[in-house]
């Protein structure tokens, strides 16, 4: 299955994202702690924790830092009051946006999320307003690789789909609970992924033009700058031509 490269949609934001690495680590640690607290410290029997571990390793977090976070969660700590909250809304150009948060103060979090939507011409919706457009999946990514080899190994390991992109990148889609097992099987076959994460995959895309694309990117940046926001999912599609103008 061929598709438009997601790397083209994100490469122009790489520098800004690299600058946020410290904040990304903080958010990953918070997810590791929460996942371990809720489901135990063994990634093999805790899919949420395994997904967090895979994300931590994909972002080059050390095993020592990772293990300390898990130990904090198992032992109970100051993050015990954290809860997962999902906000839904519409961004620039009618994009569907889902915002996953970990928060100990709902009032603070919703105020920050609503502010980001309002400042960029979007609006915060009600529960269920856009979530029906997304499916929770595991995504195992290869920047380059042999399509036939990866596809054969992935499907043999239980993957649901394999998507190839114009620039040679390949994504393997799995049931989110099975992502860790599929990644292990791929590595056992000599195929080391560049990234693995649980994501919300949209069923439809909204094409962004030169006017709406910068507004969408600003919304994403504002949301990601919120300490309580863990992940931002959207169905905006930015073409190579539009990305080149940003």
Swiss-Prot record:
GO terms for cellular component: cytosol. It is found in: Cytoplasm. InterPro entries: Integrase-like_N (IPR017856), TACO1_YebC-like_2nd/3rd_dom (IPR048300), TACO1_YebC_N (IPR049083), Transcrip_reg_TACO1-like (IPR002876), Transcrip_reg_TACO1-like_dom3 (IPR026564), YebC-like (IPR029072). One of its GO terms (biological process) is regulation of DNA-templated transcription. Keywords: Cytoplasm, DNA-binding, Transcription, Transcription regulation. One of its GO terms (molecular function) is DNA binding. HAMAP family: Transcrip_reg_TACO1. Belongs to the TACO1 family. This is Probable transcriptional regulatory protein KPN78578_23430. It comes from Klebsiella pneumoniae subsp. pneumoniae (strain ATCC 700721 / MGH 78578).
């Amino acid at each position: 299955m061929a598709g438009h490269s997601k790397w083209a949609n994100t490469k122009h934001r790489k520098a800004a994202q690299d600058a946020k690495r410290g904040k990304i680590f903080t958010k990953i640690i918070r997810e590791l702690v929460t996942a371990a607290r809720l489901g135990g410290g063994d990634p093999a029997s805790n899919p949420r924790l395994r997904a967090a571990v895979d994300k931590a390793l994909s972002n080059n977090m050390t095993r020592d830092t990772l293990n300390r976070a898990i130990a904090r969660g198992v032992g109970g700590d100051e993050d015990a009051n954290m809860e997962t909250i999902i906000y839904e809304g519409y961004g620039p150009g009618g994009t569907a946006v889902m915002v996953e948060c970990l928060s100990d103060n709902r009032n603070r979090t919703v105020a920050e999320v609503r502010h980001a939507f309002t400042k960029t011409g979007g609006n915060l919706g009600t529960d269920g307003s856009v979530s029906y457009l997304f499916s929770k999946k595991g995504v195992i990514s290869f920047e380059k690789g042999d399509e036939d080899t990866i596809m054969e190994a992935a499907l043999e390991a239980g993957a649901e789909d394999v998507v190839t992109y114009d620039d040679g990148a390949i994504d393997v889609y799995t049931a989110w609970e099975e992502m860790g097992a599929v990644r292990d099987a791929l590595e056992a076959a000599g195929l080391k992924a560049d990234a693995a994460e649980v994501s919300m995959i949209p069923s439809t895309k909204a094409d962004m033009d030169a006017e709406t694309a910068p507004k969408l990117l600003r919304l994403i940046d504002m949301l990601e700058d919120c300490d309580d926001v863990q992940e931002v999912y959207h169905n905006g599609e930015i073409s190579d031509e539009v990305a080149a103008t940003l």
